[in-house]
Structure formats: structure tokens, C-alpha cells
């Protein structure tokens, strides 16, 4: 489901700095004919996207992106992307593998109010069990009936059962409000600790996915600070990155343990 890992994406580089997103990765074994069939664009830079569409025109089959991560996009951005896509005869596809379900049953698109043609969901949808879903409008999905689609695990019902149970639980327990309240409490307590330290750091982002941001005039220091943070938190028994992913099984005690660490 995640759009960035098409085979052709192995040839992509960050359009802002020309670097591949993962150090040490090469497009080994990927046919050279696929190079250039996926084109990266800069998130929230609508001029950059429009320029690419003007250059490639009807060759653009779809615009695919994560609608958001830890921060909401600027107001109107996704509406503009959808308008550009449809004006060009292209599909709009959202990757909600990470941002879907925690924020809202229905995904970030429900919160933001922009419905794409196709969406990929996974992860929180099934509470960690292996499960993914590709959903969309009839017009977008109907061609699959004329395509070769196969699977080795058609009969696996565990992921389906886990997803059904998870979605029912989220709906019956007002998950949107729970994540809002829990995330804001977490951010408040972590901020108090940060404010009392000598480290230039802050916590920001939406309540369902707060993110710790280290600040330094030397950009090369930031990855080292992140690594040190993860290492020292692990020593205190808290296994995490610099992004929090609350679940409804977490308690106030878990926040206190994190803050003490």
C-alpha cells in the first residue's frame, strides 16, 4: 500500500537536496526502464507540483502522498492537490497507513475534509495484526475486476477479525476524544520536563502523534541528539523513537513513566 516503495521509487531522490531518503540504498536489481516513472514532489509546495504536472501532463496517472504526518497541512493545500489532479485527469491517492485510524475512524481525510479517489490503510486499523486495505470510489476501483490480482493468503481471517474488533472498539469508546485528551496530557507533562532542562528541544504535533524536535544551529548534530535520546530512553525502559504513537491501552501511568525517564 505505501506508495514510496514501488520498484521505480528506488531511483528517487529528495527533490530538495538531491539525496536518497535512506543512506546506503542503491537501485540494485531494479530495471533501468523503471527510472523516471515515479516523480517526487515537495510536500506543501503547490507550485512545485503544478510545474511537474505541466511538464508531464497526461503521463501523470496519479498523485500519491501522505495527507499528513504529525502536523496538519496548511489550510487548502490538499484541496489544491485534488483540483490539480482531477483537472489533469489524474487520480488522487492517499497513503493513510500511518496517519489513519488513530486520529479518526475514517482517517485524516475525514478530519481534513478532502476525499481522495483511492486510499491505503493499515497498521492501527487492525491494532498491530497484519492487515491492509485499499479502498476508493467505484470508478477508481472497478478496473481491478479486469486486472490480475492474486494472493497467497486469501483465506486468512485473523487480520479481518482484528480490524473489525478494533474499529468497533474505537467507535464505541469515542476514540477521537480519547486521543485528543491523552495526547494533550502527554504533551503538557513532557513540555514541563523540557522547559526545566538545558536542552533546546520542544514537543509539537497533533495529540494522536506528538513529535519531539531537537533544535540546533548545527544541523548535523540533530540526528546525533535523536540517537542519544532513543538510546537513553531505552536504558530507562521506554522503547520509543522521537515520535509518540499512543494507543488506547496506554494509561496515565505510562505518561508518568515516560516523563520520569
Spans of model-derived segments:
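PLP-dependent enzyme catalytic core of the Aspartate aminotransferase-like
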Residues: 171-173, 232-261
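Structural signature of PLP-dependent enzymes
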Residues: 166-188, 219
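PLP-dependent aspartate aminotransferase-fold enzymes
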Residues: 1-59, 184
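Conserved PLP-binding catalytic core of the aspartate aminotransferase-like
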Residues: 183-187, 191-229
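Active-site PLP attachment segment
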Residues: 112-144, 155-162
Amino acid at each position: 500500500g505505501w506508495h514510496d516503495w514501488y520498484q521505480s521509487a528506488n531511483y528517487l531522490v529528495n527533490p530538495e537536496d538531491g539525496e536518497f531518503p535512506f543512506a546506503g540504498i542503491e537501485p540494485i536489481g531494479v530495471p533501468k526502464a523503471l527510472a523516471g516513472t515515479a516523480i517526487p514532489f515537495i510536500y506543501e509546495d503547490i507550485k512545485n507540483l503544478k510545474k511537474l504536472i505541466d511538464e508531464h501532463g497526461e503521463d501523470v496517472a496519479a498523485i500519491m502522498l501522505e495527507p499528513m504526518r504529525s502536523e496538519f497541512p496548511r489550510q487548502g493545500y490538499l484541496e489544491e492537490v485534488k483540483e490539480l489532479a482531477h483537472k489533469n485527469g489524474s487520480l488522487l491517492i492517499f497513503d493513510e497507513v500511518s496517519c489513519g485510524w488513530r486520529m479518526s475512524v475514517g482517517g485524516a481525510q475525514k478530519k481534513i475534509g478532502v476525499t481522495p479517489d483511492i486510499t491505503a490503510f493499515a497498521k492501527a486499523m487492525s491494532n498491530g495484526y497484519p492487515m491492509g486495505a485499499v479502498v476508493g470510489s467505484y470508478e477508481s476501483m472497478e478496473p481491478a475486476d479486469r486486472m490480475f490480482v492474486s494472493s497467497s493468503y486469501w483465506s486468512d481471517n485473523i487480520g479481518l477479525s482484528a480490524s473489525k474488533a478494533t474499529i468497533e472498539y474505537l467507535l464505541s469508546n469515542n476514540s477521537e476524544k480519547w486521543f485528543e485528551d491523552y495526547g494533550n496530557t502527554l504533551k503538557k507533562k513532557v513540555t514541563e520536563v523540557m522547559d526545566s532542562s538545558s536542552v533546546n528541544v520542544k514537543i509539537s504535533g497533533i495529540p494522536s502523534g506528538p513529535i519531539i524536535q531537537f533544535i540546533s544551529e548545527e544541523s548535523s548534530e540533530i540526528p546525533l541528539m535523536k540517537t542519544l535520546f532513543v538510546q537513553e530512553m531505552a536504558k530507562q525502559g521506554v522503547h520509543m523513537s522521537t515520535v509518540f504513537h499512543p494507543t488506547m491501552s496506554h494509561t496515565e501511568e505510562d505518561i508518568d513513566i515516560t516523563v520520569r525517564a
